[in-house]
Every structure is written in C-alpha cells, then in structure tokens.
Regions:
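Conserved PLP-anchoring active-site segment centered on the Schiff-base-forming lysine
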Residues: 78-100
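Active-site phosphate-binding strand-loop segment of PLP-dependent enzymes
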Residues: 113-171
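Short beta->alpha connector loops at strand-helix junctions that form conserved
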Residues: 90, 109-113
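A short helix-loop-beta submotif of the ANL/AMP-binding
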Residues: 102-108
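N-terminal small-domain helix-loop-helix segment of the aminotransferase-like
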Residues: 1-67, 74
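Short acidic capping loops at alpha-helix termini that bridge into adjacent secondary structure
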Residues: 57-62, 82-85, 132
Length: 171
C-alpha cells in the first residue's frame, strides 16, 4: 500500500535552510511579520513569478502565509457559514473535509473515478448543487491523483457554475 494522504518529506531539512533559520535567531529576526508578509519577500516573489512563470503581479497583490493549508482554511472560515455546502470532488486531499467541518459546513463529495481520470463532469457538478451550495473546491492538478483538467473541461464546469453566481470556486 502506498499512503497518498499527506505530503510529508522523505528528506531532512537542507543545511542552507537550517543555517538561515539559525542566523535569523542569532540576529533576533524573530518577531511577528506584517500580515501580508515582508515587502522585500513579496517583491522577490513578484520578480520570480514574472521571470520564471511569465506572470505579472504587483507585490501588493501577494500575501505570504504559513502555507497553502492555512490559506485554504482562512478562505473557508471566512466564507462558509454553518450549514453551507461545499462540493469536493473525490479522491481529495484529507484536509479539505476537516476545514469544512471546522467552519460548520457540510461536505458534498462527488466521486471521480479512474474511468474519468479522477475528474468530475459537468453533469456530476450540476447534480451536486443545491440551494445550500456555497463553494466548489477544485484542485488541478488534483491532490492526491495528479489529474489535470483541460481548458475545455474547466470551461464546461464554468458553464454550469455561470448559472449559480453565488457559488464560490476555491482552487
């Protein structure tokens, strides 16, 4: 059995990262950061996104967090009210369901099997939507399967969602 539930590294922290952490402690660089992250870091991220990914973001558009898990949870907690439904294609990352539970929402899972490359269809999405649906949580590439929705597949899902303007998409 191969456990695909969490992405725990199978390697030790690289020495240069350890040294940078030790240096930060030695230089008393240990206080709370600005909410969006240090501007120098946000500028470096903006430069990286432009140079390596061809994406143009202003540093003011970038928020640094403790990781994707924190950011996803923040969005869910800020937008999901008790009883709201969140549609989640499965298989899915183990933390999604727990985040929705924390917000007192209800998870609506939509099975996506190997025969459809672990991707939901527009028909499945439409069938999962109710008056209580508040969000579609869609991950592409999928965690844990690695499946990637094509442009046409995303467009077909977007066509369904266009009929429901109050449904948020968290991706």
């Amino acid at each position: 059995m191969i456990n695909l539930s969490v992405g725990e590294p199978d390697f030790h922290t690289p020495d240069h990262i350890k040294e940078a952490a030790k240096k930060a402690i030695d230089e008393n660089f240990t206080f709370y950061t600005p909410v969006a992250g240090y501007m120098t870091l946000r500028k470096a991220i903006a430069a990286k996104m432009k140079n390596e990914n061809g994406l143009d973001f202003a540093p003011e558009q970038i928020v640094v967090s403790g990781g994707a898990k924190q950011s996803l949870c923040n969005v869910i907690l800020a937008t999901i009210n008790p009883g709201d439904e969140v549609v989640i294609p499965t298989p899915a990352w183990v933390s999604y369901v727990e985040m929705v539970k924390l917000a007192e929402g209800k998870t609506v899972t939509v099975p996506a099997g190997v025969e459809q490359d672990f991707k939901i269809t527009p028909e499945q999405l439409e069938a999962a939507i109710t008056p209580r649906t508040r969000m579609l949580l869609l991950c592409s590439p999928s965690n844990p399967t690695g499946s990637v929705y094509t442009h046409d597949e995303l467009k077909a899902l977007a066509d369904v969602l266009a009929k429901y303007p109050d449904i948020l998409v968290l991706s």
